[in-house]
């Protein structure tokens, strides 16, 4: 399983629209594997291509909101328990104080 660092750059338009305009990942232990993109869709596509990989964000609470929004607007359903995972679902671990620990997207359930 590969591990990456990841970060989003965002912009706000008219106080009510914020979007990812740039992203970058770097494989931990292989700095030659540096990927960049210009929108959240290309980031999600890259994550899907890197099956079973982990992406570490410096500020998951902020960047993770974009991932969750993307998932909810692209046919994914949030499930609370891993035993309820199906295709196109996601799980989160967020504390009652709003601390984000994990967001896991399941494109297809492992059989």
Region annotations inferred by a language model:
Residues 1-111:
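Metal-dependent nucleotidyl/phosphoryl-transfer cores and adjacent nucleic-acid-binding surfaces
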């Amino acid at each position: 399983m590969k591990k990456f660092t990841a970060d989003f750059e965002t912009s706000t338009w008219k106080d009510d629209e914020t979007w990812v305009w740039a992203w970058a990942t770097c494989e931990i232990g292989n700095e030659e594997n540096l990927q960049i993109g210009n929108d959240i869709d290309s980031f999600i596509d890259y994550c899907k291509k890197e099956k079973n990989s982990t992406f570490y964000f410096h500020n998951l609470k902020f960047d993770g909101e974009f991932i969750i929004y993307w998932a909810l607007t692209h046919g994914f359903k949030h499930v609370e328990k891993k035993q309820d995972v199906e295709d196109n679902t996601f799980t989160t671990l967020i504390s009652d104080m709003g601390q984000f620990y994990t967001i896991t997207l399941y494109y297809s359930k492992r059989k």
